[in-house]
């Protein structure tokens, strides 16, 4: 892997082994000539180690580096501090441009066209005899043109450079031009990089405050930590990639090795370009000068441009883009959703200050952008009149309430697919519900961050005189870091992952494997670590305002809770509990002290778990001592009931209220009617006696008087009574006869009198036209049927048959007027009881109660939810 090599490590040197001590093979890029690379050394050893041979250029480079300090002293004495600072600032800018633009252009053309290699071959720079001369010609004396003299000089100089630099056993002509060109190229890289580093260090040194009070503070301590970390990054990076990649060797020839991800390369993407520049910011902290910080930001940013336009394209052409089929899973899911749903369009996404996937025909996009525009314009036009305290409360409440709303949706969706069910039961599709969620989530992010930006901006504006410029810039850097994290996260997991697609469309996931590509190679939950650094950046920008600290804490806590208690359990449920160790985790666990601490914690955890398990076993051991008869509650209840019935019969031999076949059947599945046999002594019977049907939970323990209404679920005991109450309550009387001692009869409760709710019920025999209870039946169960859901056709058939028996189906449509006890809610419960899904009343009204549409819609919803399981 090619890597940048600037700043601190060049002054420290490498503690790693020389690359030549390892048996490495290489080959040229175009001609595929195989060779063994020679022994080379890192930059600092090559220039300053007196035990190594030095070429002319290396001596000149070392002299140029040392001369900078003498020049600094002379200019300082003659022109003063400010002029010297700007003098070396201009030098640094020159060398930085020479690095990023100069070396960048050279490497660009070398990568695409092998320009340097072809130039060396064309002009025979590393050949014994030039290609255009025969063996008997004298190249140095017979070359009269300026061009030939020039290339003859270059040829001799380059060969002299390599011979004076390399060991005696190095055969210049035995190696291909690529390796020799690379050795010469290294010399110019040494000059530019060392000058870039030294001029920057001198500029920083001249910017350090003279007051000891300004130097010895928390900023300097943090700065030293960053510098030391930067040194470790450089040393570890050189240990991993050696100077083959340190000097962009793969632009010239290829070693037989793969891209390496070890050590510091497990901590951060492109560590030499990212965390490899933390020393810049450490020095800026020590100086406490925003001008130094701006220069450092310029140097770092230009390095990212070098990475983007030079190194990354070359790495992708040489090694591939580093993605595999698993890493592209989410992207393929996005494509699949678009392919299978023609009305689906990619969601609007806010990234930094821009919006992606804007759809001019989608109203919600205008609503989102309009909200931002209205808030911004309103703030600008009324900035003087805005009360910051009220605005703070608004930001806090908006963030908290909207987060609770978002978290509730995700939690309930994870537990029961609640959000998807809500839309399915109202006639919408699974993907449509996902689109609505995408809008809600993006609007939540846009709204909360817009309010945060407005509040922070007004805070800075109202206290600008007290704002530290360096803190302001550092805060903006943290904001940029969070924006970068968001973009890298979305790049790694695509729109599907960004919008928690596995909560809503888990049936689209073909491979149950978490991605470890991109930023997820280094962090398991980047949004939890780097996803709030920008908010803490606002704390810096506002000079540690208490209100901004409160908002930053709120952002951090809500983010942590969402990841820890909602996202992580759901991910474990979908992808399994396979523990994914991040690159940072691997590196930290590789450090011996931390590994020892981790082992101690694991041992303590195992001891605690073992003790809890042993205690649980001891506490549960008493259950085994209970007699078996006491553990069978059902059998015990049956014995109690039989004993009570026996006592009641002896006390009143002519009082009886029994359900027909109650010994055989205690659970009646609708629409099965329930027939009741009753018997009453002749002296107690009244023609107005009636029997009501009640839920046991409603009547409770009141056995003498019924204190709840029957709601129409009652029947007379005689056909001659209750003439003004319609036929329904008399037609249920199927038999009645009297003897000298008692009156007995039969009453049948069919679908016109029964409840259409699952539950435990009982019959109550009431005396006369009152609610005084004479007899109570044995409790029994009524349940809705489970219709055949094998196919949508069978489900429709069973549904229509049931509705016909209940007398609520006419012309294939549901008509609840036929049975006042079977309404829309009963139909919803019937469908839910059979197929496990629920349709909304609004949807069933919208389709005119069509049994065919309703049954097939419920079937489709079941198929969708089953695929999400």
Swiss-Prot record:
Keywords, ordered alphabetically: Acetylation, Endoplasmic reticulum, Lipid biosynthesis, Lipid metabolism, Membrane, Methyltransferase, Phospholipid biosynthesis, Phospholipid metabolism, S-adenosyl-L-methionine, Transferase, Transmembrane, Transmembrane helix
Reactions mediated catalytically: a 1,2-diacyl-sn-glycero-3-phosphoethanolamine + S-adenosyl-L-methionine = a 1,2-diacyl-sn-glycero-3-phospho-N-methylethanolamine + S-adenosyl-L-homocysteine + H(+)
Pathway(s): Phospholipid metabolism; phosphatidylcholine biosynthesis
Compartments where located: Endoplasmic reticulum membrane
Record has Ribonucleoprotein as a keyword: no
All ranges on the Lumenal side of the membrane: 2-55, 108-187, 234-258, 311-362, 411-439, 485-534
Entries under InterPro entries matching the protein: Phopholipid_MeTrfase, Phosphatid-EA_MeTrfase_fun
Membrane-spanning parts: 56-76, 87-107, 188-208, 213-233, 259-279, 292-310, 363-383, 390-410, 440-460, 464-484, 535-555
Domain of life: Eukaryota
Positions of post-translational N-acetylserine modification: 2
Ranges facing Cytoplasmic side: 77-86, 209-212, 280-291, 384-389, 461-463, 556-869
GO cellular component: endoplasmic reticulum membrane
GO biological process: methylation; phosphatidylcholine biosynthetic process
Protein EC: 2.1.1.17
GO MF assignments: phosphatidylethanolamine N-methyltransferase activity
Membrane topology: Multi-pass membrane protein
Keyword Cell inner membrane among record annotations: no
PANTHER family assigned: PHOSPHATIDYLETHANOLAMINE N-METHYLTRANSFERASE
Function, in words: Catalyzes the first step of the methylation pathway of phosphatidylcholine biosynthesis, the SAM-dependent methylation of phosphatidylethanolamine (PE) to phosphatidylmonomethylethanolamine (PMME).
Listed name of the protein: Phosphatidylethanolamine N-methyltransferase
UniProt organism field: Saccharomyces cerevisiae (strain AWRI1631) (Baker's yeast)
